[in-house]
Amino acid sequence: MMAWVMGLPAIAHVWDELAILARPNNEGTFTLEKYSFLQPTTYTNAVFFDFDNDENLDLLIMGQGGDWNISGDIKFVTLYRNLGPDEDFRFERVPDAGFLQRRDEGFYNPISTGDFNHDGYTDVLIMSNQNGRHIDLYLNDKGTGRFIRQEIDFEAATNGSVMFGDLNNDGWLDIEYSGYSDKTSTALKTYINQQNGSFADLTPDNLTGAFQGQSTLADINGDGTLDIISTGNGDNWACLAPIYY
């Protein structure tokens, strides 16, 4: 049955792969631009971040085809450079950015960005599932538009989320993620930044995560350290929402 996305009758069919940029107008409304130089996808995750330090937010999109206009076998991890005010903030695809073309199996939070090595450029952390489970860390090559995959031995998980955050207050970004791993359906891992390009698995024994859900970091109790909130499904499809202080 034909159906249309509410509010987008002239732009988007619900089964269509989409890429819509909503630009704010002065009167508080938005102008919707279909495709807008962006790759249409389904099962999409997108993150704005400034990869080249020009003070314009760039865009990273993960997704796949939906067997409507694009084969579902085709996966995308695509980087777009914001061309700034001289080009009306139009986005231009960055060729050969270095990301492996695969996506995660859920709709959760498989991308995080942050400067893990203190070089002043924002790096990218990605969870994906393509011929196995993967947690991939990509080093920003000085804002050139190239990202270099780092050889770090993470215990991979999928169907969950990844986060950068300073877990031990040493001023360096650590890594936390939850999801379904090859060992357990309720993986929750913490990797501490060793300040030399490597990470150490220092996961406390009491941490239990979830799949088909999300985990996030926040200082809930105001003690100056990040806490972990994990939500999703566990064994036997139990609904879980643990908080770790």
Residue ranges of model-derived segments:
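Beta-propeller blade termini
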Residues: 1-4, 44-53, 108-118, 160-167, ...
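Solenoidal tandem-repeat scaffolds enriched in leucines and small polar residues
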Residues: 64, 106-112, 127-129, 159-164, ...
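Blade-edge motifs of beta-propeller repeat domains
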Residues: 15, 20-41, 80-106, 138-157, ...
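Hydrophobic strand positions within the blades of repeat-based beta-sheet folds
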Residues: 21, 59, 79, 124, ...
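Glycine-aliphatic tripeptides that mark coil-to-beta-strand junctions in extracellular
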Residues: 1-9, 55-61, 120-124, 171-177, ...
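Intrinsically disordered, low-complexity linker/propeptide segments enriched in Ser/Thr/Gly/Pro
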Residues: 1-14, 18-25, 60, 125, ...
